Design a protein with these regions (language model features):
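Short, surface-exposed ligand-recognition loops at beta-strand->loop->(often short) alpha-helix junctions
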Residues: 9-20
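Residue-level signal for secondary-structure boundary sites
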Residues: 14-16, 60-62, 96
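Short hydrophobic/aromatic beta-strand micro-patches
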Residues: 7-9, 53-55
Length: 101
């Protein structure tokens, strides 16, 4: 399993747009085989900081998601509106209350 955590902050005037862009790519992700991945986005309170946690069964599904046009568009627009650079962390999966993949 591949687990990646990405934390970043956007400019305050971009928070609403960022949420809209997230919902757009999540809509497309929901059309894919959800048994192969879990993609979760969190916002730190009412702040401008977002955390994306992605869990992929394998490299193939990760590559597929990273090529979804709406996700690429989200990344492009987000990068133009960053308040802080994204921090990317590769995590080790220990366990969950729900069976994954």
């Amino acid at each position: 399993m591949i687990v990646v955590k990405v934390t970043y902050s956007v400019h305050d005037d971009y928070i609403h747009t960022n949420k809209q862009m997230i919902e757009s790519f999540l809509k497309d992700f929901r059309k894919l085989d959800g048994t192969q991945f879990l993609y979760t986005i969190l916002q730190s309170g009412e702040s401008n900081t977002f955390v994306h946690i992605s869990q992929y069964k394998n490299r193939e599904i990760q590559d597929q998601l990273l090529k979804v046009p709406s996700f690429l568009h989200f990344q492009e627009q987000r990068d133009k509106n960053l308040a802080t650079e994204p921090k990317i962390e590769f995590m080790n999966f220990i366990g969950s209350s729900k069976n994954q993949f």
